[in-house]
Amino acid sequence: METWALILAAGQGSRLLSTIGIAKQFFVWKGIPLYWQSVLQFMHCARIRGVVLVFPSEVKDNEEKVVDRLAAQYDLRLPYIVISGGKLRQDSVKNALNTLPKNCSHVLIHDAARPFISPKLINNVIEVLEAGAVGVVPGISVTDTIKQVIQGEVIVTRPREQLIAVQTPQGFHLKTIVEGHNRATLEKWTVTDDASLLELCGHTVQVINGEIENRKISFPQDLLYMVEQPKTTVPIVGYGYDVHKYVTEDQINQPIRSMRLGGISIPNAPNVVAHSDGDVLLHALMDALLGCIGGGDIGLHFPDSDKRYDGINSAILLDHVLTKVLESSIKIVHMDATIVAQLPKISQYREAIRSNLSRLLDLDLANVNIKATTEEGLGFTGECKGIKAIVIVTAIRIS
């Protein structure tokens, strides 16, 4: 499954434009435009393989330069495409769908005016797609009574228990949503969200719980939600340790994996025995993160007796752990790791590993440290029988 994200920033934003003189998606918050807040959240999800950003045609060239600068500044280790939007929202989406690579199978479509999207919600949408859904939308319960009105007169009052307020990102099987947009062009349909096209084509759209915090910035008063309130913090430290054996002749019937460290492939290194992908560094990191929240260890969450995790990319498991960290109101501030092995030599891969972990953890590169050492020929690592990793994570609990 190859999933890309489309971030729509091509709207006129007329409500805010008339008040503060700038379209909402370009409003600068915490030093960056609103649309980049969404890019950062998608960037930290291992399942996302690339991003398409859609801007008004008159500012596309300028914003492409801004995106290039931000991508370098924030070490965006994802392919990205910058394109011009169309007259209507659905025209912008169709333009973006046509730019996706051939190997893309699924897409998440997100409004840039929702900067408070969480990695947890992104992962929840993707998980439903992985289970076979062709369309999925997040939604929250409606608390107000909703009435249908024509020319100032109430026509009908809708039972609010049957209603939800739909959010983005909305997730789709790519071929299905492309067919929906193509049919919309033929039938001259105009819709306000992409899920409506699947509904009109007779497809089932699944609904998952959205997030109240995932609000849309539309009116000037919405900017008040962007003012952060004072919070108290408590420092936390998590410790993680993991070991993997190297493959020997008597282990040829066990699961054998090519070596990966911190999500980076290490060529010409010894193969490891492992149920998942055998990334000893990510496994130690996950244990350290779980230690921060009192969450047990990775064996509890991803047992090696479960075939679902056979050969799985450990970055996907890390996504699940990071979601639990976010749910616990924990903010990671630093990680320090030591890799212990006689072989392979880590020095030439150190910066690639740091950069990838910086992206996955949403940390500045300066707050990610990777060390490597040997045990001077002693023990199982010194005898080239295996590798181990030790990780210390520093975090704060916010309340």
UniProtKB/Swiss-Prot annotation:
Residues where 4-CDP-2-C-methyl-D-erythritol 2-phosphate binds: 242-244, 275-276, 297-299, 302-306, 373-376, 380
CDD domains in the record: CDP-ME_synthetase, MECDP_synthase
Catalytically driven reaction(s): 2-C-methyl-D-erythritol 4-phosphate + CTP + H(+) = 4-CDP-2-C-methyl-D-erythritol + diphosphate; 4-CDP-2-C-methyl-D-erythritol 2-phosphate = 2-C-methyl-D-erythritol 2,4-cyclic diphosphate + CMP
Site (Transition state stabilizer): 15, 24, 275, 374
Annotated keywords: Isoprene biosynthesis, Lyase, Metal-binding, Multifunctional enzyme, Nucleotidyltransferase, Transferase
Annotated region described as 2-C-methyl-D-erythritol 2,4-cyclodiphosphate synthase, given as residue ranges: 236-399
Cofactor(s) named in the record: a divalent metal cation
Signal peptide start-end: none
Binding, a divalent metal cation: 242, 244, 283
Pathway info: Isoprenoid biosynthesis; isopentenyl diphosphate biosynthesis via DXP pathway; isopentenyl diphosphate from 1-deoxy-D-xylulose 5-phosphate: step 2/6; Isoprenoid biosynthesis; isopentenyl diphosphate biosynthesis via DXP pathway; isopentenyl diphosphate from 1-deoxy-D-xylulose 5-phosphate: step 4/6
Gene Ontology molecular-function annotations: 2-C-methyl-D-erythritol 2,4-cyclodiphosphate synthase activity; 2-C-methyl-D-erythritol 4-phosphate cytidylyltransferase activity; metal ion binding
Enzyme Commission number(s) of this protein: 2.7.7.60, 4.6.1.12
2-C-methyl-D-erythritol 4-phosphate cytidylyltransferase: region residues: 1-235
Site feature: Positions MEP for the nucleophilic attack: 160, 216
GO terms for biological process, alphabetical: isopentenyl diphosphate biosynthetic process, methylerythritol 4-phosphate pathway; terpenoid biosynthetic process
Keyword Metal-binding annotated: yes
NCBIfam families with a match to the protein in the record: ispD, ispF
HAMAP family noted in UniProt: IspDF, IspF
Biological role stated in the UniProt entry: Bifunctional enzyme that catalyzes the formation of 4-diphosphocytidyl-2-C-methyl-D-erythritol from CTP and 2-C-methyl-D-erythritol 4-phosphate (MEP) (IspD), and catalyzes the conversion of 4-diphosphocytidyl-2-C-methyl-D-erythritol 2-phosphate (CDP-ME2P) to 2-C-methyl-D-erythritol 2,4-cyclodiphosphate (ME-CPP) with a corresponding release of cytidine 5-monophosphate (CMP) (IspF).
Family assignment from sequence similarity: In the N-terminal section; belongs to the IspD/TarI cytidylyltransferase family. IspD subfamily. In the C-terminal section; belongs to the IspF family.
Protein name: Bifunctional enzyme IspD/IspF
Species of origin: Lawsonia intracellularis (strain PHE/MN1-00)
Gene giving rise to this polypeptide: ispDF
